[in-house]
Amino acid sequence: MTKDAARLVLVVEDDVSVRRPLVKFLEMHGFAVVTAETADEGLEMVRKHRLVAAVVDLRLRRGSGRDVVVSTPNEVPVIIFSGVPSESAELERLRPRTRLIEKPYSLVLLVETLEEMLSESQNLHS
């Protein structure tokens, strides 16, 4: 059964010490969150849920976040967080509605960027 939420965000991050505070912060800001630790789990979540956005770490222990980014529907905003900006630069050029936030990142900046991208989405569909 899919999680039905107006503001459902996928977080793909294999490091629990990064994932846990990110999920809590997103929930505090009114988002429902589904998580994945591997690229395969992330791909399953993309297929299974109606997402408003995805936050994806490119470097995972098992698989590449890149697979999740390119498999996410183009209308869904994706925030990539990475410690290696050159990795995500190509994805930002190739996939619409993709932004990079470099590690270490601010949770406040991440949520502000997410809200901005969602606002842009609503304006496109108005």
Please give the residue ranges for each predicted region:
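Acidic, metal-coordinating helix/loop segments flanking the phosphotransfer/catalytic sites
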Residues: 10, 35-53
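Hydrophobic/aromatic residues positioned on beta-strands within the core alpha/beta folds
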Residues: 81-82
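C-terminal output helix
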Residues: 23, 101, 105-125
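Conserved phosphotransfer microenvironments
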Residues: 57-72, 85
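As written
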Residues: 65, 93-101
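Acidic phosphotransfer microenvironment of two-component signaling modules
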Residues: 16, 37-41, 108
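Two-component/phosphorelay signaling modules centered on CheY-like receiver
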Residues: 16-34
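Conserved acidic carboxylate
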Residues: 13
